[in-house]
Amino acid sequence: GRRHSDPTDLVRDFTLMYSDRPTFAHVHLTEYTHDDLNGVKSYDRDLALKLRMMERSGALDDTFLVLMGDHGYRFGGFSKTRQGNVENNMPLLLVMPPKSLEEEQPELVRNLRDNNLLLTSHWDLHQTLRHLLALGVGQQRVDTFYTGSLSPGSSLLSPLQPRTCTEAGISLWFCSCPEDQRVIEPDVARQLLEAVLEDINVFLQPLELGCQELE
């Protein structure tokens, strides 16, 4: 089948061929990274070379490029570590604005850089794309274009303030900010478990289902 070099070449050719009109392309690459934790290392150099070639060819002159993962490594020993949990909840997101945007509206690119160390999510990326659409149709003020939707995000091209996971629209289940804490002592947990099992056994006994007693 096709290898990852083909889609990246297609992206370059696509941006060059349609450089005179607005376009959108989504390429999903999984060959080297999905099932192998070490695959990223072998893919990293090749991808960097491809991006440099695209930059030299002019394919990125007016292209807003987003390189992102949909999730981290979700199985295996690494996924059970603290770092593995963080990467799963906060996958890679790299945003490369075109030179034309920095020349025409440098404050937007400056906002993007300032937001680099803030908590962001896919909601913010969605609003960023809406922001770009507003710029594409020549709106001077884009606030009314990309706010007021069902998305809780904010454009990464706008100034952002430090936020909590709740404020950023991130479920607490996927929030990597709080540290893991032991909520109860082992002895208390054991007592609770024994009490629950006893209640279940009492409930099942008169039913005569032949169930083995839980312990």
Where do the PLM segments sit?
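Class I S-adenosylmethionine-dependent transferase superfamily signal
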Residues: V11, L47, L51, L65
